[in-house]
Every structure is written in structure tokens, then in C-alpha cells.
Design a protein with these regions (language model features):
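Cellulosome-associated attachment modules in secreted, modular CAZymes
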Residues: 349-411
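Acidic/polar surface patches and capping/hinge elements
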Residues: 1-355
Length: 411
């Protein structure tokens, strides 16, 4: 929730369980109606379409963001992205919050690492405190338990139990004599519950060449889309560490760079056909994971845990909210350590927000004398940011003229 989306009582009217994303994103016929981000703010050009089969996309993001064994872990993943798309490409041109003077690369790396590490540590404390307190189950436990109970939709049908799985035609059904699983494994399964899903690691012998595929399995044998050696983390689900870490990191990157967008307006990660996936062979085509904004990557990380069967949606939203608060607070605290002098140069009240009203540097709603004094403190410097009103990376005469034109105006 961002303060703009209307609140809803029924989550199903807000979120499309089957297709993912908001219900409002889809047309009445079920096709996707969203257009993503219209224009790259760095190039001024429209983003090119990047259409990918959902079966490939779902599996790829589940593996890309899994961060399990032999990985940099969920917090470490965001350090990888920081290095890959911010620190290395912008070497020699780093400005804290995208404003002020250019900062030497090593200094910028150390200070950005401090801010991000602090946020990741605080998110871990919050997430695992909640996990320990609520001790909430994972999807694999819930689904298998409910499958053993039966179905909860129709009391007149076989195997009814109020704690069973709801029947969904084509997805969750009662096994009858004509069902392909009626005598699976030489055992009579008539009356049991079947689920149409990813069939799991039991159908994979050689991951490099085999695919489990999608089909009917006994619901009591349901698997999340993960490695058989690392299926579901052995600790409580609520709330999602991935969602908290990712939202906090995205908040940090926005403040660190002074922009909602990745440098250049697009970050991409290559995905090669039949090479990228580890759990099984795939994907079926070559494409790039793409994120225009930092929040795009954060949201994808959170979604990957739902589509991978590691978290239900209830684990996601509260974690994002905590990540939002932790990311901002940790960054502000880091600034008191790494840039106290620069904060004083900006009037002693911290850094100027990137979306400040032009000329209203102290954010009091009026372009006045105190703003003029703040501007004079930066005059002649090779800075970017709020004082650089002509976007020349130099605080000079043209910026002064703009300020004088705005002087006395209310914001």
C-alpha cells in the first residue's frame, strides 16, 4: 500500500492469485493490460516490450532470487546489485543522494556499504523476531496438511472436511475412477485430492536435461519450486525476509542515487535458454530480467517467494512495510555517521530531498531569504542536486537567475 491505492476488504478483488499482480492490471478477457513504465527518463525513449512466457518467468525469478545454498544470501544479493549496477558503472561520478560534490570512489563504496549493511542487519532483526514470535507455517506444511484432511468445498462430495483444500476445477479436484491418478503407484486414490501443479523433484533424474513439467500429482505430495536438497527454509514463514530486505534495499538505493530509476534507466540480468535454471532444464527461451526502477527489482524479489511456493501473500505485505521504514531510517542514521559535515553545509537539517519545490531548499513552502542564503553557501561549486537548477552540475549564474525568478513564490 502506497497511500494512493484504495483499501479493499477482499484481497482477492485486489490481487490476481492465478496471474500475479493487481486485478486492475488485467483486461476482462484475462490478458495483461499494463504497459509498465512508459519512457526511460535517461534516454527519453519508450522501453521496448519484453514478453516472456509466464512458466519461464516464474521459474527464473524463483531461482534468481532464491539465494539459498552456495549463494551470497538475500541481503548479499543486494550488495551484488549495488556493485554491478551502481558502484562500478558510475565510478568517478558518485554523488551522495545524487547531489553535492563528486566523491572519491573508495569513500563512496565504504559509506554506501555501511548504509546498506545497517539496513540489512536491522531488517534481519525485525524479520526473525517476528518469525520467532508468530511461528507461522509454510505453504508446504499447510497444503499437505489440508490435502490429508480432504476438500472443504462441498459437504455432499467425498472426503469432505472443513479444514481441507478448496476445490478449483482444473487445478484442485477430487480423484474419481477416471482420473489419471486413481491407481497411482498401484494404490487406490479414489476420493483423495489431486492438484495440477509443478510436479516436483521426484520427476527429475538429471537436472541439466530433465524437466518435471506441470501435471496432476497427489496434493499430499506437493512441492515448492526449489531444489530437493533445499526445499523450504527450516524456520517460520511470517514474515518474509526477502520482502523486507528487498524493500529496504530499494529505499536505500533511491536515497543513495537521488533517483527512483537504476542508472541509465534500466538494469538487466541475462537469462540463457536451457542454461540458467538449476532445479531443472530451462528456460525455453533466452531473455533478460529487466528492472527500470529499484522498486521493480524489490517487488520481483518479493513475488518470487510467492510464485516459488515459499511464502503465501500474507507473509509479503507486512514485510515490505517494515522494509520501507527500516530502509529509510537506517539510511538517515548512516548519514549522521558518514556525512555530518556535508549535512551541515546543507543548512544543518540534512540533505535536500530530490523532489523539493524548485528554490525552496528548506522546504518551508516559500522561496525566501533563508533559501537564498543556503544557495549562496553552494555558489560556484561543481555540485549537482537541488541547487543545480539548470542541471549543469555547476552552481552558477544561471541557477541564481532561476532562483531570483522564483523568489517570493509559494510552493
Amino acid at each position: 500500500y502506497d497511500g494512493e491505492t484504495p483499501a479493499v476488504e477482499d484481497f482477492a478483488s485486489f490481487y490476481d492469485w492465478e496471474q500475479g499482480g493487481l486485478v486492475s492490471w488485467h483486461n476482462p478477457d484475462g490478458s495483461f493490460g499494463g504497459n509498465g513504465h512508459q519512457t526511460n527518463p535517461y534516454t527519453g525513449l519508450p522501453y521496448e516490450p519484453n514478453i516472456v512466457p509466464r512458466g519461464d518467468y516464474g521459474r527464473v525469478i524463483a531461482e534468481f532470487w532464491a539465494d539459498g545454498p552456495d549463494s551470497e544470501t538475500p541481503p548479499g544479493h543486494w550488495f551484488t546489485l549495488l556493485n554491478e549496477f551502481i558502484l562500478v558503472p558510475n565510478a568517478g561520478a558518485h554523488r551522495w543522494r545524487g547531489q553535492g560534490p563528486i566523491i572519491e570512489d573508495q569513500e563512496f563504496v565504504v559509506k554506501s556499504y555501511l548504509a546498506l549493511a545497517g539496513a540489512m542487519h536491522d531488517c534481519a532483526i525485525s524479520a526473525w523476531s517476528n518469525k520467532g514470535y508468530y511461528d507461522y507455517l509454510r505453504p508446504v506444511s499447510a497444503l499437505r496438511y489440508m490435502a490429508e484432511k480432504g476438500q472443504s468445498t462441498d459437504p455432499t462430495q467425498p472426503n469432505y472436511h472443513p479444514a481441507g483444500l478448496p476445490l478449483v476445477p482444473g487445478l484442485i479436484e477430487i480423484i474419481d475412477d477416471a482420473h489419471p491418478l486413481s491407481d497411482f503407484g498401484g494404490v487406490d486414490h479414489v476420493g483423495d485430492i489431486a492438484i495440477h501443479t509443478w510436479k516436483g523433484p521426484d520427476y527429475i533424474e538429471i537436472p541439466q536435461i530433465d524437466q518435471s513439467g506441470v501435471g496432476w500429482i497427489l496434493a499430499e505430495n506437493w512441492w515448492p519450486y526449489q531444489r530437493p536438497s533445499f526445499v523450504t527454509p527450516p524456520f517460520a514463514g511470517y514474515f518474509s525476509g526477502h520482502s523486507a530486505f528487498s524493500r529496504a534495499a530499494a529505499e536505500q538505493f533511491e536515497m543513495l542515487t537521488g533517483s527512483a530509476y537504476w542508472p541509465g534507466g534500466l538494469a538487466e540480468w541475462p537469462v540463457n535458454m536451457n542454461q540458467f535454471l538449476v532445479f531443472e532444464d530451462g528456460p525455453s527461451m533466452t531473455f533478460n530480467l529487466q528492472w527500470a526502477t529499484f522498486m521493480d527489482a524489490s517487488n520481483e524479489s518479493a513475488l518470487s517467494r510467492i510464485w516459488g511456493g515459499i511464502h503465501p501473500p500474507v507473509d509479503d505485505a507486512p514485510a515490505r512495510y517494515v522494509g520501507m521504514m527500516v530502509g529509510k531510517n537506517a539510511f538517515h542514521f548512516a548519514e549522521t555517521i558518514v556525512f555530518p559535515e556535508l549535512a551541515m553545509e546543507f543548512g544543518g537539517t540534512g540533505f535536500i530531498a530530490s523532489d523539493v519545490c524548485v528554490g525552496d531548499f528548506n522546504a518551508d513552502g516559500l522561496v525566501g531569504s533563508s533559501d537564498f542564503l543556503l544557495f549562496l553557501s553552494a555558489y560556484g561549486l561543481g555540485w549537482a542536486g537541488a541547487y543545480d537548477m539548470d542541471d549543469s552540475s555547476q552552481i552558477g549564474a544561471s541557477d541564481l537567475l532561476i532562483l531570483l525568478q522564483k523568489f517570493g513564490q509559494n510552493c
